[in-house]
Amino acid sequence: LCALSMGNRTYLLISIIIALAWVFSLLSVHSAEKTIQVSSGLSGQKVNRGDVVSMEITVSHKGFLPIAPVALHMRATSNTPAGTIHLTQLGKRRQRVVHKFAADHVGAMFPGMESYTVSDVFGFFKHDRQPDTSGQELLVLPVPFEVEPLTFAAGDMGVETMKRAMEDPSSPADIRAYQQGDPLKRIHWKMSARKREIMVRQFEEPALPDALVLLDTSPPLLSPGLPEDRRPFLCDALLETAASVVACQIRQDNPVRMPLVGDRPMEYSSRMGLPVLLEELARCTFNETEQFERVVMMQLAELRKTGAVVIITTRMTSPLCDLIVRMKRMGPNVRLYLVTFVADDPETAPLVAKLQQAAVEVNYVTPSGS
């Protein structure tokens, strides 16, 4: 309008250039937005805590006009902060970027893009779009560490007792045909001579007492004065302590069970294998609203065949202390893992002393983020 009113050719030329640029920008964004494809892939869907994960993001479009580098708005997870990645290859129809991050915390998450921005090269138009899919699930598994093997209560049958019972020649449960690897002392010579084939004695296998692992899946208790970003480290320590105890029992060929409550309740048994437990622990959300004391109380009625109990928590209250002492008096050995950043807390010290007086084994676990 200014160019037309003043009759200046220079202004008219500038106006035409701006108008063409505006039309060019609109067409470039519109054509790219209609044909754009955004995909992402992870280097692995299951990784251990502490591993480095690579995410490859590919952006392509079939628009006939160039556009500005696409801006990728990354989704915030416990391992990836929210942020924006600007692709640097200006004008190319296919752009690729590799985003690396460390899996610092255990959990199940969907790292990737929350949205992306398509804009023209002049910056006139910007359109935000969301990807068609939420991306691949990343499962960060807990990493077990070395713990002391559990000791079972006196009078319980251990591995050596079971072996002796299995080798008692005076109490066979059945007789079967010989199999490769059977010891000679199990051969029933009289029965073998009668049947004219080698027969061996079969013995009943006495059941070993199992170990019970109780994990507190309520929101972890953070010591006063500590920043909120320390809470994920408490969750990691809880999960890895539970995985470590179970892994130790499996290596010792001792049965262990672990009831899990929360969004995915289940009764884990060592017969399921350690990988199943690691995946279930990785999906634990620590949003259980039921008090842990009630969970412990529900297990008191099932301690008849339990030789050892492990309790893993971040809080120590007077009711929980009384329940642990009561559990110890019922027979099994009890071990407590108290996960905390402050081991010398004056509020919990009297309760810990009470547990130790009742012959409860108390262990402190300091999270890795201390």
Language model region names:
Residues 20-268, 308-312, 326:
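An amphipathic, basic-hydrophobic helix/alpha-beta surface used to engage anionic
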Residues 162-165, 182, 269-272, 277-283, ...:
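Short, structured secondary-structure boundary patches
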Residues 1-31, 56, 283, 287-370:
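Von Willebrand factor type A / integrin I
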Residues 225-226, 260-300:
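Flexible internal linker/loop segments at domain or repeat junctions
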